[in-house]
Amino acid sequence: MLGGTASLGGDRVTEYRTPAPAPAPGRVAPARGLVALATAMVVLGGALVAALYVLFVRTATGQRFDQAALLRIDTNPERTRDIVGVLSDLTIGVILAVLAVCMVVSLLRGRLAYAIAAAVLVAGANVTTQLLKHGLLTRPDHGYSYSTNNSLPSGHTTVAVSLALALLLVAPRFSRGLLVLVGSVAATVVGVGVVVTGWHRPSDVLASVGVCLAWAGLVSLWLLLRGSETPTSRREPGGHPGLALVGAVMAVALAFGYGVRPDGTWRDLVVHGCTVAAIGLGTALCLALTSRVVPHDV
């Protein structure tokens, strides 16, 4: 900031600058790269939702491919019933229980801001999903599905991903890698599960990941700008992308081993594999980026 000028001998003018205000005691200024990364997460998440909606909902070609992927990932009725039973347990009670854990962990560690961020992330992502699905977005009838009700984004996937991210926000640094791994497995299993049951198309699942990514970036940006960094804050380089990817691969292998695979042609198998891989990579990226951008004390 330009503070003023000083004259020397009537000829020379020297500019002086007012120093930037120091961070609050016990805090450090956020790195610009992390602020940029959090901002990019918000933009990327929003852009992903918009692109999926325009390409796979608004266009006839997109609807055809999306519906074909849905049909090729279907499995036998017995497996579907089992998956429905598991997904039905993702109720409001589960959300409240996980949020309660987040609150307790944050308060015990003296990090009220992180408890607030976790609650805002879960509430914001799930409310946004419901508003988009039932209020703001419509699905034109191009003749490729039996229902014209919009199903993008997936509510169940939003619940799973947002809860995994909330736990990642409040957990101590030593447990972050394990949470990235477990969260990637759980979120991918739920994402694949809602497609297998026929509740959602693949684009719905990926859109819910985009919603969660945007909200994770938003609350991370708030934590960074408010000065939640401390001198002991540390990050593992890259945010454990390897563990996130391993978790997604484990989830896909678990689904295949359980019988969630097509019984048709090689073409069906390729489409099936690409679909579950896209879901797994999307959830892994979301968790890895959030782990990278959020400060964690030992």
What are these regions (language model features)?
Residues 48, 125, 129, 190, ...:
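Alpha-helical transmembrane segments of multipass membrane proteins
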Residues 116-145:
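Hydrophobic alpha-helical transmembrane segments of integral membrane proteins
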Residues 47-58, 128-137, 193-197, 249-260:
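C-terminal TM-helix exit segments that contain a strictly Trp-centered aromatic cap at the helix terminus
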